[in-house]
Regions:
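Conserved short histidine dyad/triad with adjacent acidic residue
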Residues: 17-18, 33-47
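Short, charged/polar surface micro-motifs in flexible loops or helix N-caps
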Residues: 28-30, 39-41, 60, 104-106
Length: 106
């Protein structure tokens, strides 16, 4: 496998009806995805066996876990351990872009 540089601003894509999520790279052990959300879109709270690292690249949103919401914004990184409930809402008036690294599990 060769090294790869991902240009996040060039890879952003949005959909009107729901969030746009696209896998940018995967090697069977880990993957990098780009999550693009217009205002009002969300990822419903859920769990799975893999861990996430979410890096907020643009905008701000509400990170949901344990029945609570916490504002996240550009420059912040969210670490979600495997089997922890998590979701995100874009309740702002601007687009939200998150680079997601997932390792282990599904």
């Amino acid at each position: 496998m060769k090294s790869l540089i991902l240009d996040i601003p060039q890879l952003k894509k949005f959909a009107d009806d729901k969030r746009h999520q696209e896998t940018l790279w995967s090697d069977g052990h880990a993957r990098i995805s780009l999550i693009c959300m217009k205002p009002g879109q969300e990822i419903v709270t859920h769990t799975h066996h893999g861990s996430h690292i979410w890096m907020v690249m643009e905008g701000r949103g509400n990170f949901l876990t344990g029945g609570k919401a916490q504002v996240i914004e550009v420059g912040q990184v969210v670490v979600v351990p495997a089997l922890e409930d998590h979701g995100i809402q874009n309740l702002s008036a601007e687009n939200l872009v998150i680079a997601s690294i997932t390792a282990g599990g599904d």
